Amino acid sequence: EIIAVDNGSTDDSVHNIKQLFSEVVIISNQNNVGYSGGCNIGAQSAQGKYLLFLNNDTEHSKGWIEKLVNFLDSHPDTFAVQPKILNIKNREYFDYAGGSGGFLDHYGFPYVKGRIFNTLEKDTGQYDKASEIFWSSGAAMMVRGDIFNQLNGFDEVYFAYMEEIDLCWRAQSLQYKIWSVPDALIYHYGKQTIKQNTIKSHYLNHRNSWI
């Protein structure tokens, strides 16, 4: 099943989806409830064993979903997995949002494989082996639905940014693991909803780091 959550958009998004993809379940929110709120609302209507949270500004390689499903099927101790995420405008480089999996430094600040601050690494196969990570990118992450519900989903205090870090952290407190599965591949535009280097994006990033 495919569920599209519309966070109070004012363009023709909902109309276009209805016209082009009649099989898609559309949930329309009157207001923008943020990434966390939107995902939680969508998850409440989902029936699957696994939940795939996916940004709307992505393109995908063939079979990538099956590869994530197969990994979760064969790793029952894993809560969440993410694909390799490359930049859609320059497909030889990792994407800003998640690259090949995230970690926290000794001060609690996040970083990812594939990016050093704002500098993106070229993908030369250096992260092509599946590996355990601390957090999976919210741009594309597949999770176990029962554990997601047990964790009460995303914490909606995080309107945008770092909600996936909090979720993965809480899952690990229950002894579940988080993995990067790089043979599953997607491409991400990035910063299409909240533009980079705006006051709002800086505020949310820094506030959420401290939360």
Predicted regions and their residues:
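Acidic donor-binding segment of Leloir-type glycosyltransferases
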Residues: 1-31
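Glycine-rich, basic loop-to-helix element that forms the pyrophosphate-binding segment
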Residues: 28-46, 56, 67
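Conserved donor NDP-sugar-binding/catalytic core segment of glycosyltransferases
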Residues: 59-98, 102-109
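A short, conserved alpha-helix in the catalytic core of glycosyltransferases
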Residues: 128, 132-185
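Active-site-adjacent helix/loop segment of glycosyltransferases
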Residues: 173-211
